[in-house]
Amino acid sequence: MSHSAVSQAGAVSVSIENQRSLRRSVFKQNNSISFNSKSWSSSLALNQKTTSIRDGKRYPSTTICMSVQQTSSSKVTVSPIELEDPKDPPLNLYKPKESYTAKIVSVERVVGPKAPGETCHIVIDHDGNLPYWEGQSYGVIPPGENPKKPGAPHNVRLYSIASTRYGDFFDGKTASLCVRRAVYYDPETGKEDPSKNGVCSNFLCDSKPGDKIQITGPSGKVMLLPESDPNATHIMIATGTGVAPYRGYLRRMFMENVPNKTFSGLAWLFLGVANTDSLLYDEEFTKYLKDHPDNFRFDKALSREEKNKKGGKMYVQDKIEEYSDEIFKLLDNGAHIYFCGLKGMMPGIQDTLKRVAEERGESWDLKLSQLRKNKQWHVEVY
């Protein structure tokens, strides 16, 4: 599928600073399209039904057009604004026995060739029937039979949603997932054993536009973004695909123009990955640094490229220790701290925080208890 520039009466010229960043952030459909100095019509409707051709086959798809005026400001207009109306988050609208059938819009590999493994950004069309809030998760039921329960479907796999409630196309009809393909290699032979590969992650990464997908949810309240205080500080810590909910947070803070939702606090992201090629959504985050230097900080831990102060591999907990004085002061002043990623990251982080607390003459157990009591501590690991 391609997105063609059009010339009509009333069209305006749009100069795009970063083609690749815009393509990944908004259009997601075609990796070869050029956006420089194109003219875009302000009157094209959303969701024009078309077909896309992939591997010689036709797939139904949707042309998405972004409103022209959005490019003249630093933020994007979103709709429908009614998504802001509910006072409580949507929960479990669809359950495993009565799941929702959505469609795949696009699947894009979002890591470089030197990254260990493959991670995909997957856009799903739910047609506005599966509303969610930032920080929630969808459940995915892969096709096929559960090998442990003959005749029964596969178990639900949960994935953090990597977009705001308005989706990657800002129209409230899509949601995005960030999925690492789970591949098993035999420790003795070093060869891949497809029978032990992750069923759901491989299904998602192999999906094509137009493929159907069974969704449950949305679920989760622990990682919901508190928005009652626009001046709040949010410290976000992630490894790998754990960055997914933070992409939604940051888009809401810095990319989208939502009425009465102006963020003037501090968002501080710590991301741990193997190497530069493994960085996820790096162009988006780097743009926020440029556009909002007073409200966004971004620190990376590249375990295969950097060394910590002891000469070992640089992990995210080493970055936390490096900035521990600032982090503890921010927590003392009410900052929220979030953790998302592999559960194996938490022991090292907890040990670091405990050691730093003791060096400061504080009890970490007491401090952690207080953070939980004040609802400043948010953890979602898998």
Curated annotation (Swiss-Prot):
Q: Which cysteines are joined by disulfide bonds?
A: 200-205
EC? 1.18.1.2
The organs and tissues expressing this protein are described as:
Expressed in shoots and roots. More abundant in roots than RFNR1.
Residues bearing Phosphothreonine are 233
Modified positions (Phosphoserine) in chain numbering: 201
Gene3D superfamilies annotated for this entry? Answer: Nucleotide-binding domain of ferredoxin-NADP reductase (FNR) module, Translation factors
GO MF, one annotated term: copper ion binding
Q: Which cofactor does it need?
A: FAD
Instruction: Tell me the ranges covered by the FAD-binding FR-type domain, including all copies.
Output: 97-225
Q: Which domain of life is it from?
A: Eukaryota
- Which amino acid positions bind NADP(+), per UniProt? 235-253
Q: What are the protein's UniProt keywords? A: Chloroplast, Coiled coil, Disulfide bond, Electron transport, FAD, Flavoprotein, NADP, Oxidoreductase, Phosphoprotein, Photosynthesis, Plastid, Transit peptide, Transport
Where in or outside the cell is it found? Plastid, Chloroplast
One annotated Gene Ontology cellular component of this protein:
chloroplast
Transit peptide range per the UniProt entry = 1-64
Keyword field contains Chloroplast:
yes
- Induction per the UniProt record: Up-regulated by nitrate in roots while down-regulated in shoots.
Q: Which reaction does it catalyse?
A: 2 reduced [2Fe-2S]-[ferredoxin] + NADP(+) + H(+) = 2 oxidized [2Fe-2S]-[ferredoxin] + NADPH
CDD domains per record: CYPOR_like_FNR
Return one Gene Ontology term, BP aspect.
Answer: photosynthesis
> What is the predominant subcellular site recorded for this chain?
plastid
Question: What is the role of this chain?
Answer: Maintains the supply of reduced ferredoxin under non-photosynthetic conditions.
Q: Family assignment?
A: Belongs to the ferredoxin--NADP reductase type 1 family.
Q: What is this protein called?
A: Ferredoxin--NADP reductase, root isozyme 2, chloroplastic
Q: Which organism is it from?
A: Arabidopsis thaliana
